A protein has these predicted regions:
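Active-site donor-nucleotide binding/catalytic segment of nucleotide-sugar enzymes
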Residues: 7-11, 18, 173-179, 199-256
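Short amphipathic alpha-helix
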Residues: 15-27
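An aromatic- and histidine-rich active-site surface loop
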Residues: 44-47, 116-131
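Active-site-proximal region of nucleotide-activated glycan assembly enzymes
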Residues: 130-198
């Protein structure tokens, strides 16, 4: 039996949503019998337990390091302090990384995965590379373009991209060029482009039954409109919501729907 390890980064809900969509259709493409093991922490771990109550032995809690929450998303200052000092019940990041990689390595030793799929989890990506296990890395960013005022982040971005490119194949959750929405977050190097596949937005293909037109549909009918998907962590979503509220209450927006 083919054994697949799926490692889901627990920051926000986007990684979980994408992996569940992929997991739902894998049986259409993998013809031999297979078993999936999931790994994550916090709310994602509990969602997995609720979704797969009969497979709890295949759901593993791995304490993957995540940024420290601020008022409007991750706090850069607190996250930097957390590199060497404990913050908000989080041990120093150096200790977290060591512990989490050790736990993931033990899981690899125990389960003997034939294929690994990582959505946001670079640690597992590195382990798979070192053990010569075929791996997929799902992402919508590689080396994002930054404002000059944020150029000090480039060393970290280069480090992260180096870990992502260790995957056997990189799956971009977006449409291929020239219709790529997240193109400014990618900027793949020439040697990496050969292993990149654009796989779409992981949207559901379930047919929606047509019902009576809702008030929302009436509001946007025959109008140009946009929407925002809020799939980040709670503080990021709250901060984004507050900013949108401020914009929508400005005088320039009075005549807008």
């Amino acid at each position: 039996m083919l054994k697949i390890g799926e490692f889901i980064y627990p920051w926000g809900s986007g990684h979980y949503s994408r992996m569940m969509r992929l997991n739902a259709i894998m049986g259409d493409y993998i013809k031999e019998k297979f078993e999936v093991h999931f790994s994550s922490k916090d709310h994602v771990y509990h969602k997995l337990l609720e979704k797969f109550p009969d497979h709890k032995d295949q759901i593993h809690q791995i304490l993957m390091p995540t940024p420290i929450d601020g008022k409007f998303g991750p706090s850069i200052l607190l996250s930097l302090i957390n590199l060497l000092l404990p913050v908000s019940k989080n041990p120093p990041l150096v200790k977290q990384v060591t512990s989490y990689l050790r736990e993931e390595s033990k899981l690899y030793d125990k389960e003997k995965f034939d294929l690994v799929i990582n959505d946001g989890d670079m640690g597992s990506n590195i382990i798979a590379k070192n053990r010569q296990i075929p791996s997929l890395f799902i992402t919508n960013q590689f080396r994002p373009k930054l404002y000059r005022s944020r150029s000090y982040f480039y060393p970290a971005l280069i480090f992260v991209s180096k870990q992502i490119e260790k995957a056997s194949r990189i799956l971009v959750a977006d449409s291929p060029p020239p219709y790529t929405m997240c193109e400014y977050n990618l900027n793949f190097t020439k040697d990496v482009k050969e292993k990149v596949t654009y796989v779409g937005h992981f949207t559901t293909s379930v047919n929606i039954e047509k019902k009576a037109i809702s008030d929302l549909e009436k509001l946007v009918e025959n109008s140009e409109f946009g929407y925002w998907m809020r799939t980040g962590n709670r503080s990021t979503n709250d901060g984004t919501g507050q900013r949108y509220e401020q914009v929508f209450h400005q005088n320039e927006m009075k005549n807008e729907k």
